[in-house]
Structure formats: structure tokens, C-alpha cells
Swiss-Prot record:
Disulfide bonds: none annotated. Its EC number is 6.1.1.7. This is Alanine--tRNA ligase. Zn(2+) binds at H574, H578, C676, H680. HAMAP family: Ala_tRNA_synth_B.
Length: 889
């Protein structure tokens, strides 16, 4: 029974029994405390907690889940998987144990012909909570299960709780006896390898109190309404019903695993190390496909990092098995989409998008590996040469900091060389870097003063009242003066000063908007030029500048005035940022979320999440859409409301940003609506013009758009027009023909480069004749081994091997082994003729001998194969081992 059919039968059975079928929720959890949905009941959690009224009394679903806690264990056993599907039925105060237990039994034991799963009742066991006599009685008297197949367990195994405090209750688990060949008799309490859990029925009837661990907490009392939450793992159920040993042999994971084996020239079940890699690949490719389909994008934080990590683990295991730098993820993703597509048709509909994102990450990681592996290999050699067994924490940090190697990748690679990593030093260096970055960020906010200085001013004078949304100047009272990091009563001409006022029109730098500049004037006595405004602690505005003339004293009444021209220019940039954000989301989809911004006078930059660059058409589309909104002169409106109400209105919030209960919404009449505390124009037409300069990468999965606004944009358009005119004159072509003229020049350049490449390859192949003449005899066989110059491509190595093999003829067995370092990893190619194959030699086996010496693997056809590894110092040894194998055959 296929996995899709198991899911269909489950839903159909419960729908027939009065349950509403609820589609799987996205893997991106609504619950802010969860990174990803990790259990079937997560979408229903608000109903169980009483936060929302359920729209139905009964529900059933097949929920997509990702568990991140044991990703490192995936592949090492056949039980662990990062993605799984949970079949469940739920009751919200409707039925309880008396119905949940018989329903489960009915579905399991009803024949396949009648819509059930056809389990033999004699092979089913159950466990109940130690004191749950009610459940035991239902199993015994209503279902008819013999007493000896009902086992009792304690709180740690058969009592479930949601949170602290929160609903909890006993559970009853149903197990399938796989037979004596899998272990000892005695039921689940004796052997959970033989007795597999297939279904867990949770009876939520109590509320728990504070306490640690699975057992040490009090029961506060019974819930007003009792609920049912059940969970059946689809993958495990599929393994049982399909008659296979484990989930990696089922119709979904098994397909991906078999294709991975084909692509890498390996056979599942022959080598445990290779089997682990194949299981990692199968699981992680499926998980990545499902995450991308639900809108997760590779990144360096939170769920984006989970996706990046599993993608990189699968890519690296693919390369370990294949021994080369081939790109296989596209092929495997296609298999995953097809394997899961019957259950989730959206995978096929979004196939192009899924491929694009995963392919881009594979390419990015290939570049990362290529750049960092040389340093890694050098560090490994240095460690081993000194007799060490621990990979340097400093080297691990450099790999992370310079090449983007996550620590888990370094741990895996080091373990393959029999080394541990000095994680303590690595984490110390990471912490030092974080502290340095934090100090640098705080230095701007704190200036020369200690945080306590600002704390005292806030405590005595209260928070600063911000008037800048409506006023560009105001009267204010000086609450505090700081010079050289110390509070003082006065500041005089020439002093670098920090002023704290009771109220201010000055905007303090925040939300990507630069601070206002201007003047603070003491009537008839002094002037301070304000160059920066910061909020070192929440609520306190600190004006930094220089006393230009006279003096300023605590308790002075001053006149604070901002530079209105600068404010207007910065406000135009900030409003343009909102418009660009909306245009990007309209062009790329909602995954193009804000990752950062900076709004300067006449100029802005906007960072957003995306896995691929914007092409010229997309940039033009964004620019045109923004300027069309400017032409409509949309009024910009502002609203202060609660966070919940703002989100209900559809206002965008920046992920990870901390908001108070009261927030400010900047609304550009349906086109753009965001939470924002910055300053903006009154209507979009005031921006004048927005010119997008281009886009670039600022990190993996994050792109940056830069743009000019207003007069700065107009000046750039004029400059570019003049530049086009100059090019037209130099290339002797009208403006409209410039693209064709430039294309022609580029084509000629590329043709010249190809000719250079052809000549270089020919130079490599010139050695073929001499190599054939240097063949060494081993019995009736001839062998040629040769190391090419570093930088010779793997393709040229294959051509050379085939050329030499052809020159050796077919009159007797001939073996050619060519090795080199195309970039930073060693590669070996073995080509043999038909006579050698008839003599029992196989190119794949010979490559395997060499690749293992290099610390990797490989495969290919019987007549030619390619492999590789990570140890460039072992190339000569690898070639010698190939020759020895031929000599001994």
C-alpha cells in the first residue's frame, strides 16, 4: 500500500466518522515559540489551550512535520528522519477514550478490501498509563484485547503534557509485533525493536503545574472539557504495510535513496559508511524540498539555517560518494517532487521554483567547499604531522569566518580523518567576535559614557518626548549634559557634548533611518551643532555635537531645530524604501522579506531575502512600479494601534524585530502597509523620482537593492544618458544599436578565450604519446600511471586517459590511471581496455582503490571511472595502489 493511499484511507475513515478533514498546515509554524511545525497537533494548539474556539468538534489531518533536534543522527540509524508526516484525529470536547480507542482499533483491523489497514489483531499490543484503569478496561472489555497484551507504563512513557502550565493526560500506545526474528518476546516493555509503535492516543483531561523533567510536576486538576489528540507516523506505517524493514525502503524515501545510489555508482547495503550517506541524502533532499515548497529559504538564522544545513549535508554526502564535483541535487529533487507529488500536488506546480532555490544553494556550497577545503586539508596535514588528534579551534573559526563553513560541517569532515575539533576554542572565538561586534554597535549609541550615566538621566528626567512627526522645531529644557563620558552641569565653546532634553523634534537613528542634524540654541548665550542623535537606552534621546559658541547649562530652556532639508530628503528615502519593499514582494513573491535597510539623504539601500539575483527585467519592473505609485501621488497615512490589530490589518512586521504592544502603521493606501516608527512624506508624489542603481549579494540568501531618490535620482539619469552618448561616439554606433555592438565585441573575446582553452587542452594531450611509450609491464598487462599538473580539469584528465588507452591498443590488457588536483580536491581517472575487462579488471574497482587512499570514493562505467577525495598528499600513493592491484590480478 503506497504512502499516499495510507493517508487517503486514514482521512476517509475519520471523515466517515464525523471528522472534518483539515489540510496540512505550512511547516512554518504560526506559534512564535516554534521554529517549524514538529507535531500533528501544532495547528490545533490554540483550540486545546482555549485561545480560539474550534470551528468543528472533530478534525482529522495529515500534517507535515520537521524535527530538528536529532538532525545529526539522521542516516546513522534507520529510525531517524528529519521530515515526517503525522496522521491524526482530534476531538475538542466532543468524544473521549470510550470512542477514540474503538475507532483506532476499527481502522487498524478492518480488512484492506473494506477500507482499513488489515492488521492481524493477534499481532497488536497496547500500553496504558500506570493508573489509567479506564483505558485498560475499554481495551479489554469493549475492544476484546486479552489482558496479557495490555501493558502498563509510568509517567515518563505513557503520560503526555503540552506545556507549563498546560493540558496533560495519560496516553495509550498501539504496537505491532514484527515477529521473533526481530527480538525477544514480552511485548513493548521488553523489546521495542520487535514491537513497533504505530499509533499514540493522547487523552487530555488534566492541567499540569510547574516542574522539571517528564515526571516531576503536579497535576492541578481536571480540564473543563476533555480532548483527544492522536498521532500515527505515516512513514513507519508505510514500512509495516509495505513489508520492508525500515522507512528508508518505503515507496517515498526508497525512491530517492535508489536514485542517489545510481547517480553516485554505489549499491545500498554493501558498505555501512556509504549506506549512512545514502540515508542522509534521501532524508535531507525530501526535507529540503518540502521546506522550500512551504516558503523557507536558505539562510544563516533560524529556519533558514535548518534548511541550509540539511541541504549542505546532503550535497557533501553526494560528493563523498561520487568522488567528484558533479551537481546531482536537481535530479534528486525531481525524484522527491515526484515521490511526494501525489499527496502534495503543489510540489509539481512549484517545481521550477523549488529547483531554482536548491540548485542555487548547491552552487553556492560548491564555491564554499572549493574555497575552504584547501585550508581544511592543510590544517589536517599539519595536525597529523605533529601527531595530534584534535583539529585546531582557531582553524575551525577561520573556516567559519572566512569561508562560511558551519561548525557542524567541520566536525563531520574532521571525524572522517579521525580527528576531534577543539570546539571550546572555536566557541570562545565566536563569542569574542560577537562581543566585539556588539561593542562596536553599542559604541555608536553610548559614545564615551557608561550605560549607567544614561540610566541615571532616564531615571531622574524620564523618557524624552518625541515631537518630530509634527514639529521641526520646539522649545525644550536641558535635563542632562555629558562631556567626556561624565555628567556635568555645563558645556562651553569647543566641547564635544551630549545633551538630553525633555522633548525634541530630532529623530534618533533607528529602523534604518539616519538621525536628524540641526542646532540647539540657548537664547542669547550659546549654540550647539547637532551631528547625531542616538538612543543608548530605550526612551532616552541623546543629541551629540559641538558647542559652536557660548555655553549651555543644565535646566536651560533651549530652542531645538532640525535641518528640514536633510529631514525631507531622508524621509523621501524612507518612503521609497517601503515602496521598493512592496514592489519586490509583488515581483518575487512574499518570500522577499526585509533583512535590513539604510535611509540617507537622497539615497537608500534595502536588503531582502532571496536566493537568486534580480535580473534586468525584474529590476526594471520594480523601478517602473515604484515610479507609477509616485505618479499616482498616494496619500501617506499614519495610525497608532495595538500590535495584534496592526497585524490583522495586514501590516508587515520585520521578522525578529521586537515590538511593544502599541505600534505605528505607515499606510500608503493598500499598496504598502508596514509597522514603522520613521518619518515619511505626506504623499508619494513628493519623492519625485526613484532610480534603482542595481542589486548585489550581501550574504548567502540575502540580496541588496540600492536606489537614488529625488534630485539625486535625476542627476544619475542625466549622467547615464551622457555616458551612453559617449559610448555611442566611441563605438561608432547609434544608441539603439549599442547592445548589438557590445555583444559582437564580447563574442569575439569569448571566441579568443575558447581558442586559448583548446590550445591548453592540446598541450595536455601532447603527453599521450610519451605516456603510452612509458607503459610498464605486469605479467600480460600494461599499466600507465601519471600525475598531471595542478589545475588540469577533470574533463581533460578523462580525455588524456582515453587517448593513452587508445594508443596502447587492444592486443593485451591495458590500464591507464591519471590523477591531479583540478581545483582543491584530488581527482583520479582510470580507463581500461576490453582485454583488461575480460581479464576481470573493472575501472570502478580500481578507482575505488585509489579514491579510498585519497579519503573519498568514486564510480563509473566498467571501462572508465572517476573518483576523488580530500587528501592531496596521497595522490602518489593512490596511483601506486592502482598499479599494485593490476600487478596482483
Amino acid at each position: 500500500m503506497k504512502s499516499a493511499e495510507i493517508a487517503r484511507r486514514f482521512l476517509a475513515f475519520f471523515e466517515k466518522n464525523g471528522h472534518t478533514v483539515v489540510p496540512s498546515a505550512s511547516l512554518i509554524a504560526e506559534d512564535p515559540t516554534l521554529l517549524l511545525v514538529n507535531a500533528g497537533m501544532v495547528p490545533f494548539k490554540p483550540y486545546f489551550l482555549g485561545q480560539r474556539t474550534p470551528p468543528y468538534p472533530r478534525a482529522t489531518s495529515v500534517q507535515k512535520c520537521v524535527r530538528t533536534i536529532d538532525i545529526d543522527e539522521v542516516g546513522k540509524t534507520t529510525r531517524h528522519a528529519s521530515f515526517f508526516q503525522m496522521l491524526g484525529n482530534f476531538s475538542f470536547g466532543d468524544y473521549f477514550k470510550e470512542k477514540a480507542i474503538p475507532l483506532a482499533w476499527e481502522l487498524l483491523t478492518t480488512s484492506v478490501a473494506d477500507g482499513g489497514f488489515g492488521f492481524d489483531p493477534e499481532r497488536l499490543w497496547v500500553t496504558v498509563y500506570l493508573d489509567d484503569d479506564e483505558a485498560a478496561t475499554i481495551w479489554r472489555e469493549k475492544v476484546g484485547l486479552p489482558e496479557e497484551r495490555i501493558q502498563r507504563r509510568g509517567k515518563a512513557d505513557n503520560f503526555w503534557s503540552m506545556g507549563v502550565p498546560g493540558p496533560c493526560g495519560p496516553c495509550s500506545e498501539i504496537y505491532f509485533d514484527r515477529g521473533p526474528e526481530y527480538g525477544a518476546e514480552g511485548g513493548p516493555v521488553a523489546d521495542e525493536d520487535r514491537y513497533l509503535e504505530v499509533w499514540n492516543l493522547v487523552f487530555m483531561q488534566f492541567e499540569r503545574g510547574e516542574g522539571s523533567g517528564k515526571e516531576d510536576y503536579p497535576i492541578l486538576g481536571e480540564l473543563p472539557s476533555k480532548n483527544i489528540d492522536t498521532g500515527m507516523g505515516l512513514e513507519r506505517m508505510a514500512a509495516i504495510l509495505q513489508g520492508v524493514d525500515n522507512i528508508y525502503e518505503t515507496d517515498t524515501l526508497g525512491r530517492i535513496l535508489r536514485r542517489a545510489a545510481e547517480l553516485t555508482g554505489t549499491t545500498y547495503g554493501e558498505n555501512e559508511r556509504a549506506d549512512v550517506s545514502l540515508r542522509v541524502i534521501a532524508d535531507h533532499v525530501r526535507t529540503a524540498t518540502m521546506l522550500v515548497a512551504d516558503g523557507v529559504r536558505p539562510g544563516n538564522e533560524k529556519r533558514g539555517y535548518v534548511l541550509r544545513r540539511i541541504l549542505r549535508r546532503s550535497i557533501r554526502n553526494l560528493r563523498l560518494l561520487s568522488g567528484d564535483e558533479s551537481f546531482h541535487m536537481h535530479d534528486l529533487t525531481a525524484v522527491a517532487i515526484d515521490a511526494m507529488g501525489d499527496q502534495y500536488p503543489e510540489l509539481r506546480a512549484d517545481a521550477d521554483k523549488i529547483h531554482s532555490i536548491i540548485d542555487a544553494e548547491e552552487k553556492n556550497f560548491a564555491d564554499t567547499l572549493r574555497a575552504g577545503t584547501t585550508l581544511f586539508n592543510r590544517a589536517v596535514r599539519r595536525t597529523k604531522e605533529t601527531g595530534g588528534t584534535v583539529f585546531s579551534g582557531a582553524d575551525a573559526f577561520q573556516l567559519h569566518d572566512t569561508y562560511g563553513f558551519p561548525i557542524d560541517l567541520t566536525l563531520e569532515m574532521a571525524a572522517e580523518h579521525g580527528l576531534k575539533v577543539d570546539e571550546e576554542t572555536f566557541h570562545q572565538l565566536m563569542q569574542r567576535q560577537r562581543e566585539t561586534a556588539k561593542r562596536d554597535a553599542q559604541a555608536k549609541k553610548l559614545g564615551n559614557a557608561d550605560i549607567s550615566v544614561y540610566g541615571n538621566l532616564l531615571e531622574t528626567g524620564g523618557p524624552t518626548e518625541f515631537l518630530g512627526y509634527t514639529d521641526s522645531e520646539s522649545e525644550a529644557r536641558v535635563l542632562g549634559i555629558i562631556v567626556n563620558g561624565e555628567s556635568t552641569g555645563a558645556a562651553r565653546k569647543g566641547d564635544q557634548v551630549e545633551l538630553v532634553l525633555d522633548r525634541t523634534p530630532f529623530y534618533a537613528e533607528s529602523g534604518g533611518q539616519l538621525a536628524d542634524k540641526g542646532t540647539i540654541t540657548v537664547d542669547g548665550r550659546g549654540v550647539v551643532d547637532v551631528e547625531d542623535v542616538q538612543k543608548p537606552i530605550q526612551g532616552l534621546f541623546v543629541h551629540r555635537g559641538t558647542v559652536r559658541e557660548g555655553e549651555v547649562v543644565v535646566d536651560d530652556t533651549v530652542h531645538a531645530a532640525i535641518d528640514t532639508g536633510r529631514r525631507a530628503s531622508v524621509s523621501r528615502s524612507h518612503s521609497a524604501t517601503h515602496l521598493i519593499h512592496s514592489a519586490l514582494r509583488n515581483t518575487l513573491g512574499p518570500s522577499a522579506g526585509q533583512a535590513g535597510s539604510e535611509n540617507q539623504p537622497g539615497r537608500l539601500r534595502f536588503d531582502f531575502t532571496s536566493d537568486k539575483p534580480l535580473d534586468a527585467t525584474e529590476i526594471a519592473q520594480v523601478e517602473e512600479e515604484v515610479n507609477e505609485v509616485l505618479a499616482r501621488n498616494i496619500e501617506v497615512q499614519y495610525l497608532e494601534t495595538t500590535l495584534d490589530e496592526a497585524l490583522r490589518m495586514g501590516a508587515l512586521a520585520m521578522f525578529g524585530e521586537k515590538y511593544g504592544n502599541r505600534v505605528r502603521v505607515v499606510d500608503m493606501t493598500e499598496y504598502s502597509r508596514e509597522l514603522c516608527g520613521g518619518t515619511h512624506v505626506a504623499a508619494t508624489g513628493q519623492l519625485g523620482l526613484v532610480k534603482v542603481l542595481g542589486e548585489s549579494s550581501v550574504g548567502s540568501g540575502v540580496r541588496r537593492v540600492e536606489a537614488l531618490v529625488g534630485l539625486d535620482a535625476l542627476r544619475r539619469v542625466s549622467t547615464e544618458s551622457a555616458l551612453v552618448g559617449q559610448l555611442s561616439e566611441q563605438l561608432k554606433a547609434p544608441r539603439e544599436e549599442l547592445p548589438q555592438r557590445i555583444d559582437s565585441l564580447v563574442s569575439r573575446l569569448r571566441a579568443a578565450e575558447k581558442e586559448i582553452e583548446r590550445l591548453r587542452a592540446a598541450q595536455v594531450l601532447q603527453a599521450a604519446g610519451k605516456l603510452a611509450e612509458s607503459a610498464r609491464d605486469h605479467g600480460n598487462s600494461r599499466v600507465v600511471t601519471h600525475r598531471v599538473e595542478d589545475g588540469t580539469t577533470a574533463d581533460d584528465m578523462r580525455k588524456l586517459a582515453l587517448d593513452v588507452r587508445g594508443r596502447l591498443g587492444e592486443d593485451r590488457p591495458a590500464v591507464v590511471a591519471i590523477a591531479g588536483v583540478p581545483s582543491d580536491r584530488p581527482v583520479v581517472v582510470v580507463a581500461i581496455n576490453k582485454e583488461a575487462q575480460q581479464a576481470g579488471l573493472k575501472a570502478g574497482e580500481l578507482v575505488g582503490v585509489a579514491a579510498r587512499a585519497l579519503g573519498g570514493g568514486g564510480g563509473g562505467r566498467p571501462d572508465i571511472a572517476q573518483g576523488g577525495g580530500s587528501d592531496v598528499t596521497a595522490i602518489d600513493t593512490a596511483l601506486r595502489l592502482v598499479e599494485q592491484r593490476v600487478a596482483g590480478s
